[in-house]
Amino acid sequence: MGRMFGTDGVRGVANTELTARIAYDLGRAGAYVLTEGAHKPKILVAKDTRISGDMLESALIAGILSVGAEAIVLGVVPTPAVAYLTRKYGADAGVMISASHNPVEYNGIKFFNDKGYKLSDELEDEIQRVIESDFEGVPSPTGTDLGRETIEVSALDDYIEFAKNTIPYSLKGLKIALDCANGAAYKSSVKAFRELGADVFVINDNPDGTNINENCGSTHPEELMEYVIKKKCDLGFAFDGDADRCLAVDEKGNLINGDFILMLCAKYLKELGKLKDDTLVVTVMSNLGLDIACKNEKINIVKTAVGDRYVLEEMVKNKYVLGGEQSGHVIFLDYNSTGDGLVTALQIAGIVKKKEKALSELCSIMKELPQVLANATIPNDKKDLYLTDDEIQNEIRKIEEALNGVGRVLIRPSGTEPLVRVMLEGENQAEIDEMAHNLANLIEKKYN
């Protein structure tokens, strides 16, 4: 078997690639590996709004109970709520059932340790090893030694209270639009903003099990962009399916991506003397415009591989407090141990309120270089072949020469889908658009 875990847990099409059997095995092996030696360990279990969540949750819980661990069921809450509540409740681990921004037919299972951090590669490999060994040495208790399932009814309110406490003042007077992606944010984000005094307008807050991320949320913010203008809001926020990321929309209906959000928050934290070593952690995918803006503001940048787990690793290692991705995964390490869409949205709203300036004006400190992303659909086992392919490497060199030092080419395999992503930045939008798609087509043609 290849590696089960991708960059964000185990993910696949529910009931074919990610079956109830796999969920049971992950529950059983995960509970064993993460709680070895603990007496009656506690594991939190949560999910987003996908129809397959019920099936996978039941199987996962069965696996957890089968090794004598307790399953504390949180219901539908955002991924960052699991990270926070694992610490708050003193649990031994937490599990989120979600495929984040992916379409409804997908689902995923990701684990958090007792500190609320995603697992290391080594721990994930150990969970897989236990499954592949057919659970050799894993206990199967009987009678009163089996685990019990309990429902934690205050989970959502405990998370909302935590998120609200990350900004110490009211948002009264702000008109805010929220796009909940028919996902895990549909209750928590609305309640938090309303309780802080904001005038809240909401779309896509009616999940039916099948409409998560469907033409809405952070992957499709167009509806929110129009809605902000229609309702004359000061700003808007679009979450993804599990609400661990968010994008913003300014009062003019312009999309504010993760790079702008990071720049805005870094500048504000630096002014308060709270940006450790005046340093921001981002990935290699961040726009070159962010580098330029940070240089102007005397903010240092540290770059990591793509994936919020690598951003987090760097932050934890050097105790940096702010980092994230262009996609809207933003980590405020003083508050939570993972990307948190609600906390991010509250910080932005707080800055707008405190500065008494429009979001468009606050974001004008950064100018974005045109950037194009093109996907090449290729089988998972061929995703790294471009690295040693002379024709493709030659094509990349040609593009780099044409960009003449103002721009770049970045190619990376997706960690969650059978795709290779081709990213180009440069001064001329039409030119880089053509180059990116030509290169993606070449890669796709060669490996299919």
Swiss-Prot record:
It comes from the Bacteria. Its cofactor is Mg(2+). Signal peptide: none annotated. CDD domains: GlmM. Mg(2+) binds at S100, D240, D242, D244. It is an enzyme of class 5 (isomerase). HAMAP family: GlmM_B. Catalyzes the conversion of glucosamine-6-phosphate to glucosamine-1-phosphate. Belongs to the phosphohexose mutase family. This is Phosphoglucosamine mutase. It comes from Clostridium beijerinckii (strain ATCC 51743 / NCIMB 8052). The lineage of its organism: Bacteria, Bacillati, Bacillota, Clostridia, Eubacteriales.
